[in-house]
Design a protein with these regions (language model features):
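N-terminal anchoring/stem segment of glycosyltransferases
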Residues: 1-61, 84
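Short amphipathic alpha-helical segments and helix-helix/interface helices
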Residues: 23-27, 72-75, 102-106
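Short, structured active-site "lid" loops
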Residues: 54-85
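Catalytic metal- and UDP-sugar-binding loop of GT-A-like glycosyltransferases, i.e.
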Residues: 92
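Conserved donor-nucleotide/metal-binding helix-loop-beta segment in metal-dependent transferases, i.e.
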Residues: 96-122
Length: 122
């Protein structure tokens, strides 16, 4: 499968029920086949992938590096996450709500990154 959805559950802000709810929403609102992976420091499910120990190296409080910058490293699949399959990637935060079909997101030109913020309001 070329289509892949990624999320991150790291720390204790969100528990694994958020990951399950995201997966359920994707199953309901994607009609195209897709891979699903959750990068986590506490793997429990078959779709969970252990975060590498170097994950914390991408956070430097003294440099005021925003935590989200570390998310960018998940797209370096060859180096950090060789088990992630696919060529088209979507990333979702765990607190997202998906209300309608999102197949069109996999039709976007994947050669450039998109950040969708408040799509519902556009």
């Amino acid at each position: 499968m070329d289509n892949t959805v990624l999320c991150v559950r790291w720390g204790d802000k969100y528990d694994d029920t958020y990951v399950k709810k995201l997966k359920e929403q994707l199953d309901r609102h994607l009609t195209v086949p897709f891979n699903f992976y959750c990068l986590t420091d506490n793997p429990k499910e078959e779709y969970d992938i252990q975060l590498p120990t170097l994950w914390d190296e991408h956070y430097r409080a003294d440099k005021n590096m925003f935590w989200a910058y570390r998310k960018c490293y998940m797209f370096n699949t060859d180096k950090h996450f060789p088990q992630i399959k696919g060529s088209k990637f979507l990333y979702f935060d765990l607190d997202i709500l998906i209300h309608n079909n999102i197949d069109c997101m996999f039709e976007l030109d994947m050669y450039r990154p998109y950040i969708v913020r408040g799509w519902w309001n556009d």
